[in-house]
Amino acid sequence: MRQTKTGILLANLGTPDAPTSEAVKRYLKQFLSDRRVVDTPRLLWWPLLRGVILPLRSPRVAKLYQSIWMDGGSPLMVYSREQQQALAARLPDTPVALGMSYGSPSLESAVDELLASDVDHIVVLPLYPQYSCSTVGAVWDELGRILARKRRIPGISFIRDYADDGAYIDALAKSARESFARHGEPDVLLLSYHGIPQRYADEGDDYPQRCRDTTRELVSALGLPPEKVMMTFQSRFGREPWLTPYTDETLKMLGEKGTGHIQVMCPGFAADCLETLEEIAEQNREIFLEAGGKKYAYIPALNATPEHIDMMLKLTAPYR
């Protein structure tokens, strides 16, 4: 009997190819055209997206990308490639591919790369610790569309999420402790997760609960009193209500009431990107300090740390 050959597909959101208005416009058009991300009726959404949002947001977002761009490209791509390479180095007999829901390398190119390596089985690991229809659901949908066009379909194992996985929590706790050792223990550890529209949660998306699961386990692992940890949501977009409390408003409130030392961790981001390096590490730092806060530190994402790669090994082990 022929032994099954397994490959691993690491999936993430994606990034513009360059910090330019045109590249950002292409990326945002693909991203904001996904019904999993924005489910506004198309007759209403297309004119708004193409006539207002893309022309206005693309130049502004491009400038933000320029402020964090690295020699090797966008931070998300640099760190994602490092994750892929580090995992592949630990699994020399297992092909590891990287695919993005939007932009390049695409999920389809990652599937094709693995099939070209003659794999019979693909383990799909979306690098979103907390499930949401707008992230993990989008990977699932695109994977189905890709495979629907193939004559040869491999076996698929799909890891839905890992919000309360022990190795993930341990990696976060180690990162937080290292930050505490460097900057001192904060008055408040703020855990900022990417937001989603409140309506998505009302309609059944269990993302808020999975964020609470991560927060509960991390607080326990760190041994912090609950009153020293807050959970908030960032990166809201549009006018409808999103999950609350909002990160920026919470930081302003904490600064105004005299909280001196804040450290912020973003447990939902597997790799640093625009939303962490610019929005959290820069914009929200200014909000807190201008409101009266004294000390602010951003705790980096897990990126390609050994503990993060150990977690990927553990999560994929049952399927290899």
UniProtKB/Swiss-Prot annotation:
Pfam families the UniProt entry points to: Ferrochelatase
Keywords: Cytoplasm, Heme biosynthesis, Iron, Lyase, Metal-binding, Porphyrin biosynthesis
Protein EC: 4.98.1.1
Catalytic activity: heme b + 2 H(+) = protoporphyrin IX + Fe(2+)
Spans through the membrane: none
Keyword Cytoplasm: yes
Enzyme class: lyase
InterPro entries the UniProt entry points to: Ferrochelatase, Ferrochelatase_AS, Ferrochelatase_C, Ferrochelatase_N
Main localisation: cytoplasm
Pathway: Porphyrin-containing compound metabolism; protoheme biosynthesis; protoheme from protoporphyrin-IX: step 1/1
Entry-linked NCBIfam families: hemH
PANTHER family referenced in this protein's UniProt entry, alphabetically: FERROCHELATASE, FERROCHELATASE, MITOCHONDRIAL
Function: Catalyzes the ferrous insertion into protoporphyrin IX.
Subunit annotation: Monomer.
Name of the protein described by the UniProt record: Ferrochelatase
Protein species of origin: Salmonella schwarzengrund (strain CVM19633)
